[in-house]
From Swiss-Prot:
Protein name per Swiss-Prot or TrEMBL: Thymosin beta-a
Coiled-coil boundaries: none
Taxonomic source organism: Cyprinus carpio (Common carp)
Residue segments, region Disordered: 21-46
Alphabetical keyword list: Actin-binding, Cytoplasm, Cytoskeleton
GO molecular function, a single term: actin monomer binding
Any Pfam family hit: Thymosin
Length: 46
């Protein structure tokens, strides 16, 4: 298994050549008001 060229390359990879990136939160959680509105809409539809 040690003769696998991909595994050898991964072990020799230098993390210093990676660039730092800033991540942006895309999936925000709903507010309490949003949840309440959805509950009221669901109850009204029954």
């Amino acid at each position: 298994m040690s003769d696998n060229p991909v595994k050898e390359e991964v072990q020799q990879f230098d993390k210093k050549c990676l660039k730092k990136t800033n991540t942006a939160e895309k999936n925000t959680l709903p507010t309490k008001e949003d949840i309440d509105q959805e509950k009221k809409a669901a109850e009204g539809g029954k």
